[in-house]
C-alpha cells in the first residue's frame, strides 16, 4: 500500500476518475445555495441533487468531486470516537444515467487495488451488499473478490424520503486482530457491531428506483435513468493509508494538535485522555471553513451550530489550561493543511480570525453570566433544602451558557450537591432527535420527470431580441409530449427564444406568442429551464398551436426593462457593499423583480444608518456617472483573470458571461442588463434587516418606484410639517425638538405630582402597621397605574421608620404586581416574594432588600396579603 499525504490521496482520487471520463466538480460552499431543505452541505451528492432528480441534465453524465461537508447530529461524540467529525471531506464518483453497477464495482476495485493507484492489499478488503442484490455479489466475485469477503446486510438499501434510491454495497478495510481484542471477527460486520477493526472506507449506492414513502419498497418504480452515487470519507482513507490509529493521527489533524500542545503546554497522548485535543482540532476546522463560506455564529440555524462548536472547543481549551481566546490562532494552521485544494481559508484568514476571536471573547462574558445562573440555582436549592440540580437546569446551562456537564457537576460537588444526569441525558436526546428528524426531512431529492428529461431538442436564448420568429419544437401537455394543443395550459420549447428563463435571481419574462397572421395564440406566464437547459415556456393557450410551425415570440419589453434596471442596480449595490462594509459582504441570495430588488449578503452586524446612506449615495453616483454596461462571453479561467467576481457555490459552465460596469463592477452573470447606468435613473434603499445569523437583507427600488418612494417620504414630511405648523419642511426638526423639550418638562411635572400623590396615599397606608413574631409589617393593596409607582411607595417608606417589612399589591390591567421591601436581614425580600407569588399564579424574585413579582389571578390578592403574616 502506497504511503501518501492527504493532499495526494485527494488528488489521486480525482485523477483516477478523470481517466474514466469523469468531469471534476469543484467543492462548493458549505452554505447551500438555492436549497432551503439543507442547513449545511452534508454530503458529496448534496450539491448534485439537481442532476439526480432530473431538474438539470449535466454536460457530462460522469462526475467526480472532493466535497467538504458538515454534519452536526451527534456533536457530543466528536472527540470520544476515532472517526467522528463535524466537518469532513467526501470523495465521490457519480453516474447520471450513464454507467451502472458493473463499471462502478470494477473501477472501485481497480482504484483500491491497482499498483498504479492506492495499491491496497486485496485480502484486506471486505464488501457488504443487500441480500436481494445478487448482481453486485456476482460482480464482486468477477473482479476477483473472495466470496468469503462478501457479507449480506439487510440494511444495505439507501433511501431518504422521496426520490432516487436503491441497494448499496460498502467496502471495508480490515486492520487486523490487534483491533479485535475479543476476536469476534466477521460477526462485527455481519451484525453491524461498532468496532475499530473493519473500517468502512467507501459506499457505492446503486440508485435505480424512485422511492415513494406511500408504497412498500417492492412497489418502487424503476428510475427512467439509473444512477451511481458513491462516497468515500477522505479522513478514513487517509487514516488507513497512513496507518494511523484514529483519523486524528493523520496529517489532516496532527498539525493543529501540535499547535494546541504549544498553546497549552500539554502533550497529546495517543493512548491516553486526548478528547480535548480532538474536539479542538475538529471544531476549528468546521469553524474556519464555515465562516470562510459566509456562515457566522448566532442564536439560530447555522449560526447556532457554529456558536455551539466554538463554545465546546473553548471549554475543552480551558480543560487544557488555556484560559484566554486561542482558537483564532489555529486558523492559519487549518488553512495551510488544506491550502492545496481549499485556498479560501488562507485568503480569508483575517476575517475568519476576527470573527472567531470576537466570539471567543463574547463567550467568556457569557460563561461569567452562566456561573451566576448556576450559583443562583444552588442558592435556591439550599433554601428549599434540596440537593439535586434538575436535568432541565443542567441542560439549560449546557445549551444556553455552554457549560459542559462536568463543570456543573464540579459546582454541585463544591456545594455538596449532585446533578440529575438522567434528566440531562433525556433533554439532550430530545434535542438530538429533533436534529436528526430535521436532517432526514431535508435530505430527500425530488422525483425524476421522465418526459422533460427525454426532450433533447436544441433551443437558444437571444439576449438582444425582444421579438423574433422561431419554430415550435416541443409541446408538453398533461405531462406528455404532444403534436398539437388547442386550449388550457401547456409548456412550449422553441428553437430560439427571446424569453428569459428565470435564473440567477432574475424573474422570467412574460409576453405573447403570435401566429403568422399576427393573431395572439398564447400568453406566456412563466419561463423555466428544462432539465436539458431549454427555455420551457408556460402558456395559456388561446388558439391551436402545432409542432414545427413558425411563431412570433414577443416579450413584454417594458417589464423586461424594469427588471434589467433592478438587475444592473444589484451589481452596483454588491460593489458598494464591498467598498463600504468589506469584501466579506458577498451575495447570499438575490431577487430581481419588476418593482423592486432584494439582495441578501453576509455581514456580522446590522448595517448602520450612516453606512446605508453611504451605500445608497455611492450607487446613485455610479448611476449619474452614466457608466457603460458591457457584456462579453469568454471561458471561466479568462473571466477570473479579468477579476470577475464569481459567487462561491454557483456552478458555471465552460463559457460564461462577464458583465462590467465601467471600471466599478465586474461579475459573472447570465442575466439581462441595461446598456448604461443612467437608464436606472434613481436608486433608493427602502429596508435593511437581518434574516438569519450572519445574513442581512436589503430591499431597494429604482427608477419610477424610487421616485415614488421619495415622494411618499416628502408627502409624509409635509403632513408632519402641517401638523406642527412649520412653514417649511426643513423647520420640522426644530419643531420636533421643541415638542420633545415640552414633553420632558411635562413628564417631570407628572412624576412630581405622582410622588406627591403617592406620599399622600402613603400617609394612610403606612399607618396600617401590624406585628407578628417581633416583626413590624405593612401589607396593603394600592391603586396605581404602573409598577413604577410601587417603587415610589417603597422609596417613601424607606425614608422613615414605619415598619420592618412592606408588601404592596396592585391590580394593573388584567395583571397583578407585587412589591416586597425589607429593612432587616432577618426578612429576605427576594425569598418572601417567591413564596407569595404562586398564590396569584405568578413568579418573582429579587434582592434581600427589594423584590417584585407578577401574576394573573386578581381574585387571590387578599389571600396573598393574608398569607404574609404566616411567612414571618
Swiss-Prot record:
Cofactor: Zn(2+)
UniProt-listed Pfam families: DHHA1, tRNA-synt_2c, tRNA_SAD
First-level EC class: ligase
GO molecular function: alanine-tRNA ligase activity; aminoacyl-tRNA deacylase activity; ATP binding; catalytic activity, acting on a protein; transferase activity; tRNA binding; zinc ion binding
Compartments it resides in: Cytoplasm
InterPro entries xrefs: aa-tRNA-synth_II/BPL/LPL, Ala-tRNA-lgiase_IIc, Ala-tRNA-ligase_IIc_anticod-bd, Ala-tRNA-synth_IIc_core, Ala-tRNA-synth_IIc_N, Ala-tRNA_ligase, Ala_tRNA_ligase_euk/bac, DHHA1_dom
GO biological process: alanyl-tRNA aminoacylation
Catalytic activity: tRNA(Ala) + L-alanine + ATP = L-alanyl-tRNA(Ala) + AMP + diphosphate
A GO CC annotation given for this chain: cytosol
Keyword Metal-binding carried by entry: yes
UniProt-listed NCBIfam families: alaS
HAMAP family registered for this protein in UniProt: Ala_tRNA_synth_B (MF_00036_B)
Protein name: Alanine--tRNA ligase
Amino acid at each position: 500500500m502506497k504511503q501518501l499525504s492527504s493532499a495526494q490521496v485527494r488528488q489521486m482520487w480525482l485523477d483516477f476518475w478523470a481517466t474514466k471520463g469523469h468531469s471534476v466538480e469543484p467543492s462548493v460552499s458549505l452554505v447551500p445555495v438555492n436549497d432551503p431543505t439543507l442547513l449545511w452541505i452534508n454530503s458529496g451528492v448534496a450539491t448534485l441533487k439537481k442532476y439526480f432528480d432530473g431538474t438539470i441534465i449535466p454536460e457530462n453524465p460522469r462526475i467526480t468531486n472532493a466535497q467538504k461537508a458538515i454534519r452536526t447530529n451527534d456533536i457530543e461524540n466528536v472527540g470520544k470516537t476515532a472517526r467522528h467529525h463535524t466537518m469532513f471531506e467526501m470523495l465521490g464518483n457519480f453516474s447520471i444515467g450513464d454507467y451502472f453497477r458493473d463499471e462502478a464495482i470494477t473501477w472501485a476495485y481497480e482504484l483500491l487495488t491497482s499498483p498504479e493507484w492506492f495499491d491496497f492489499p486485496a485480502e484486506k478488503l471486505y464488501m457488504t451488499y443487500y441480500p436481494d442484490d445478487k448482481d453486485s455479489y456476482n460482480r464482486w466475485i468477477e473482479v476477483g473478490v473472495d466470496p468469503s469477503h462478501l457479507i449480506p446486510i439487510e440494511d444495505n438499501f439507501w433511501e431518504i424520503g422521496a426520490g432516487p434510491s436503491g441497494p448499496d454495497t460498502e467496502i471495508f478495510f480490515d486492520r487486523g486482530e490487534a483491533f479485535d481484542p475479543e476476536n469476534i471477527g466477521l460477526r462485527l460486520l455481519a451484525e453491524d457491531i461498532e468496532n475499530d477493526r473493519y473500517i468502512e472506507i467507501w459506499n457505492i449506492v446503486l440508485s435505480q428506483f424512485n422511492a415513494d414513502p406511500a408504497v412498500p419498497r417492492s412497489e418502487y418504480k424503476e428510475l427512467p435513468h439509473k444512477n451511481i452515487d458513491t462516497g468515500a470519507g477522505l479522513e478514513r482513507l487517509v487514516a488507513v493509508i497512513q496507518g494511523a490509529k484514529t483519523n486524528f493521527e493523520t496529517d489532516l489533524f496532527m498539525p493543529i494538535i501540535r499547535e494546541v500542545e504549544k498553546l497549552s503546554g500539554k502533550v497529546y497522548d495517543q493512548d491516553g485522555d486526548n478528547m480535548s485535543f480532538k474536539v479542538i482540532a475538529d471544531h476549528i476546522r468546521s469553524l474556519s471553513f464555515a465562516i470562510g463560506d459566509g456562515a457566522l455564529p448566532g442564536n439560530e440555524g447555522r449560526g447556532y451550530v457554529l456558536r455551539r462548536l466554538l463554545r465546546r472547543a473553548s471549554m475543552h481549551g480551558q480543560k487544557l489550561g488555556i484560559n484566554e481566546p486561542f482558537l483564532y490562532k489555529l486558523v492559519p494552521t487549518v488553512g495551510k493543511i488544506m491550502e492545496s485544494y481549499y485556498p479560501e481559508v488562507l485568503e480569508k484568514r483575517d476575517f475568519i480570525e476576527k470573527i472567531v476571536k470576537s466570539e471567543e471573547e463574547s463567550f467568556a462574558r457569557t460563561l461569567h453570566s452562566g456561573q451566576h445562573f448556576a450559583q443562583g440555582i444552588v442558592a435556591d436549592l439550599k433554601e428549599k433544602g434540596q440537593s439535586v440540580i434538575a436535568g432541565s437546569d443542567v441542560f439549560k446551562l449546557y445549551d444556553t451558557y455552554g457549560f459542559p456537564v462536568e463543570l456543573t457537576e464540579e459546582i454541585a460537588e463544591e456545594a455538596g450537591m449532585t446533578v440529575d444526569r438522567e434528566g440531562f441525558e433525556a433533554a439532550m436526546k430530545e434535542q438530538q432527535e429533533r436534529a436528526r428528524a430535521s436532517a432526514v426531512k431535508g435530505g430527500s431529492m425530488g422525483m425524476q420527470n421522465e418526459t422533460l428529461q427525454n426532450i433533447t431538442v436544441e433551443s437558444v436564448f437571444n439576449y438582444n431580441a425582444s421579438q423574433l420568429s422561431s419554430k415550435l419544437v416541443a409541446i408538453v401537455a398533461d405531462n406528455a409530449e404532444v403534436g398539437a394543443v388547442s386550449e388550457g395550459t401547456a409548456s412550449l420549447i422553441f428553437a430560439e427564444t427571446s424569453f428569459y428563463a428565470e435564473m440567477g435571481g432574475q424573474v422570467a419574462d412574460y409576453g405573447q406568442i403570435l401566429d403568422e397572421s399576427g393573431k395572439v395564440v398564447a400568453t406566456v406566464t412563466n419561463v423555466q429551464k428544462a432539465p436539458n437547459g431549454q427555455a420551457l415556456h408556460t402558456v395559456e393557450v388561446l388558439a391551436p398551436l402545432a409542432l414545427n410551425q413558425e411563431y412570433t415570440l414577443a416579450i413584454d419589453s417594458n417589464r423586461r426593462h424594469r427588471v434589467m434596471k433592478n438587475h444592473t442596480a444589484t451589481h452596483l449595490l454588491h460593489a458598494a457593499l464591498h467598498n463600504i462594509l468589506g469584501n466579506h459582504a458577498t451575495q447570499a441570495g438575490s431577487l430581481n423583480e419588476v418593482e423592486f430588488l432584494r439582495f441578501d449578503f453576509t455581514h456580522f452586524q446590522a448595517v448602520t444608518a450612516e453606512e446605508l446612506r453611504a451605500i445608497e449615495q455611492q450607487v446613485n453616483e455610479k448611476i449619474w456617472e452614466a457608466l457603460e454596461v458591457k457584456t462579453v462571453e469568454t471561458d471561466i479561467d479568462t473571466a477570473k483573470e479579468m477579476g470577475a467576481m464569481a459567487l462561491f457555490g454557483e456552478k458555471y459552465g465552460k463559457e460564461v458571461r462577464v458583465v462590467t460596469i465601467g471600471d466599478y463592477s465586474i461579475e459573472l452573470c447570465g442575466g439581462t442588463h441595461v446598456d448604461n447606468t443612467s437608464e436606472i435613473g434613481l436608486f433608493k434603499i427602502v429596508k435593511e434587516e437581518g434574516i438569519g445569523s450572519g445574513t442581512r437583507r436589503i430591499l431597494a427600488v429604482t427608477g419610477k418606484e424610487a421616485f415614488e418612494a421619495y415622494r411618499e417620504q416628502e408627502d409624509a414630511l409635509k403632513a408632519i410639517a402641517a401638523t406642527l405648523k412649520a412653514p417649511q419642511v426643513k423647520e420640522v426638526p426644530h419643531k420636533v425638538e421643541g415638542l420633545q423639550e415640552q414633553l420632558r418638562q411635562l413628564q417631570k411635572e407628572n412624576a412630581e405630582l405622582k410622588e406627591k400623590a403617592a406620599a399622600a396615599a402613603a400617609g394612610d397606608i403606612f399607618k396600617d402597621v401590624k406585628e407578628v413574631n417581633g416583626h413590624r409589617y405593612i401589607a396593603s393593596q394600592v391603586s396605581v397605574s404602573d409598577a413604577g409607582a410601587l417603587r415610589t411607595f417603597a422609596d417613601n417608606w424607606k425614608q422613615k421608620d414605619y415598619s420592618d417589612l412592606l408588601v404592596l399589591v396592585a391590580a394593573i390591567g388584567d395583571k397583578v404586581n407585587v412589591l416586597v421591601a425589607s429593612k432587616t436581614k432577618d426578612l429576605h425580600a427576594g425569598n418572601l416574594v417567591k413564596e407569595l407569588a404562586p398564590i396569584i399564579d405568578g413568579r418573582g424574585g429579587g434582592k434581600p432588600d427589594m423584590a417584585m413579582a407578577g401574576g394573573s389571578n386578581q381574585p387571590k390578592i387578599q389571600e396573598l396579603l393574608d398569607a404574609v403574616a404566616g411567612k414571618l
